[in-house]
């Protein structure tokens, strides 16, 4: 798999992603975060299935998402729909001295990802719905929603948990939205051409 991983890293580098994003992808082994039957495809630039209809996004989509998120040292970051924990691990590699929270409604995935990331002391994973965010740990510098929100419906509770200044990245339909809060003013950019599993409200 070493050759396949090197090809992926070269591809991401050629797409212009930052050194810190490339280094995170180099450090974190994707094969540990996918089921055994699809490990052979770990470094193909494709989404792969997880449990109960969940997926792990293709690496180029994750790299683009992280570039929009703009994670920085010392930040508090929340991922909703953290799946197998791959993106949490990448963020942890970039934000080594920050605090990272993952909410995953699928109990099996939450348990597996906790075990995979138990040595990452700056990551905390909770098995619960992300609909209400994580108010007890708010505000967050960054919020990443890793499932498609319905009809441009970013829950207001999440926006209220965003620090000022702060950024939310949220898939809506076939687009990624970058929502930025600065001086109490909220702006939005849309990046079309993506596909995500839908936001699950109940387990």
Walk through the language-model features, giving the residues of each.
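Positively charged
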Residues: 142, 202-203
């Amino acid at each position: 798999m070493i050759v396949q991983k090197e090809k992926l890293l070269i591809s991401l580098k050629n797409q212009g992603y930052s050194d810190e994003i490339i280094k995170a992808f180099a450090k974190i082994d994707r094969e540990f975060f996918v089921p055994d039957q699809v490990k052979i495809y770990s470094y193909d630039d494709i989404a792969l299935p997880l449990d109960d209809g969940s997926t792990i996004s293709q690496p180029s989509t994750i790299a683009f998402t992280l570039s929009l998120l703009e994670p920085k040292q010392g930040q508090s970051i929340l991922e909703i729909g953290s799946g197998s924990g791959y993106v949490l691990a990448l963020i942890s590699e970039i934000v080594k001295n920050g605090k990272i929270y993952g909410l995953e409604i699928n109990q099996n995935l939450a348990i597996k990802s906790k075990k995979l990331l138990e040595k990452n002391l700056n990551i905390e994973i909770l098995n619960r719905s992300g609909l209400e965010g994580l108010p007890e740990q708010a505000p967050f510098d960054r919020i990443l929603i890793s499932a498609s929100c319905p009809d441009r419906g970013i829950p207001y509770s999440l926006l209220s948990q965003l620090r000022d200044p702060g950024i939310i990245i949220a898939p809506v339909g076939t687009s990624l939205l970058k929502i930025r809060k600065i001086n109490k003013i909220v702006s939005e950019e849309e990046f079309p051409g993506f596909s995500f599993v839908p936001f699950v409200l109940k387990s």
